[in-house]
A protein has these predicted regions:
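Terminal, non-globular segments
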Residues: 1-175
Length: 175
């Protein structure tokens, strides 16, 4: 029952972030870029819950992006899966009181995501203007994502703490 509740909460978080990214933040674009909320969700669950959950959350975030806005089905799912899985390696050194590690990991994830998108969606189409892409898309999106992360991460952290407390309470009833 608790696992089902965690799945439902994660699904709601993913859907809300996707809807915010594709609706409201389209109107709040700065320098024609929007924050990547799904990277924040994928990275956060990766380093909070581990590699396996980071992989699954990343897959569903990427698949949602593929189905509702991508050119290639599976491209974003693969990219987000790898990012979630790699963030899961840091679950052992994650302390929820310290925000420096989450900000660094989310920033690195956003940078890796943007570089992969550039390489596979632009450079392979003979668009070699990397510095223009870096200065006008990657860096503004990175800064905007970091600013939004300061608030969104706290919400995700609070939800994760509540779910973990409920899981611990229900586990202690059976012992």
């Amino acid at each position: 029952m608790k696992k089902l509740k965690r799945i439902a909460v994660c699904t709601v978080i993913i859907l809300i972030c996707f809807l915010l990214e594709t609706t409201i933040f389209q109107y709040l674009a700065l320098a024609s870029v929007i924050p990547n909320l799904l990277i924040v969700v994928t990275s956060s669950f990766g380093f909070m819950r581990g590699r396996k959950e980071g992989l699954f959350i990343g897959f569903f975030c990427g698949l949602l992006k593929d189905i509702l806005g991508g050119d290639l089905i599976g491209f974003y799912a693969l990219v987000y899966m790898v990012i979630g899985y790699c963030n899961g390696f840091f679950s052992r050194v994650f302390y929820d009181e310290d925000i420096k590690l989450p900000l660094a990991l989310i920033s690195a994830s956003e940078l890796v995501y943007s570089l992969i998108v550039y390489i596979f969606l632009f450079m392979l189409k003979s668009d070699f203007n990397f510095w223009y892409y870096f200065n006008h898309i990657i860096m503004p999106e990175l800064v905007y994502t970091i600013l939004i992360t300061l608030g969104l991460y706290q919400v995700i952290l609070h939800m994760n703490r509540r779910l973990e407390e409920e899981e611990k309470r229900s586990a202690s009833k059976f012992v």
